[in-house]
């Protein structure tokens, strides 16, 4: 064949899988539904396939919250537009910053005119993928307000919630609701250097659910 008919291959890119593993020991918010799996059929005489049934909270592992999670009249995750979950993003390190991510913890990395519309913050040195962390780091609501002011449409974090684990008001979630942002939680950013990437973290089309698992990846810009 004529080589002119074939466009040049793009340069190779690195892919970071930033999804938490999901299994029976995956940590969940106290009282939430852990992952479990039962086999409905197994390969053997007269059965050519393995088929399982799984039960889990949609907040197990890396996930996207729907407005329905923090707003009684909010949209389910299956009705949330997908645009926010794919596109340019910035990974910011605020490791060991304390209970709340304040603007001072991230200003060095987000205070520029080229800030992408998606910001993911790493707070752990190593994310605890096999235990619940009741002292997790959350976003200060004022930080989300200022990110929204700068055009950010999605915020992410490597902890289980953008609010403190014992919060009864979910102040940061309420900023998300009021400003129309999207949120990703339980991301694994342990191996990801700070910088700009392409985020792909699409939720399932669960038409009545308050959240959805995502297979979140980052792709390095060529």
Segment roles from a protein language model:
Residues 2-222:
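Active-/binding-site microenvironments in catalytic and ligand-binding cores
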């Amino acid at each position: 064949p004529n080589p002119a008919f074939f466009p040049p291959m793009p340069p190779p890119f690195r892919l970071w899988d930033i999804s938490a593993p999901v299994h029976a020991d995956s940590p969940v918010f106290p009282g939430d539904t852990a992952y479990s799996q039962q086999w409905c059929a197994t390969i053997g005489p007269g059965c050519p396939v393995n088929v399982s049934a799984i039960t889990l909270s949609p907040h197990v592992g890396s996930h996207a919250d729907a407005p329905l999670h923090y707003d009684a009249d909010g949209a389910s995750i299956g009705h949330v537009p997908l645009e926010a979950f794919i596109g340019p993003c910035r990974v910011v390190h605020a490791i060991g910053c304390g209970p709340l991510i304040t603007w001072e913890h991230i200003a060095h990395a987000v205070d520029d005119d080229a800030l992408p519309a998606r910001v993911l913050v790493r707070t752990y040195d190593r994310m605890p993928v096999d235990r619940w962390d009741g002292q997790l780091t959350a976003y200060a609501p004022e930080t989300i307000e200022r990110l929204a002011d700068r055009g950010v449409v999605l915020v992410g974090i490597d902890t289980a919630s953008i609010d403190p684990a014992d919060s009864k008001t979910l102040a940061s979630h309420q900023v998300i609701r009021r400003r129309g942002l999207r949120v990703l939680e339980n991301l694994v950013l342990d191996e990801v250097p700070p910088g700009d990437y392409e985020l792909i973290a699409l939720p399932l089309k669960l038409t009545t659910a308050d959240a959805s698992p995502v297979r979140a990846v980052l792709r390095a810009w060529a």
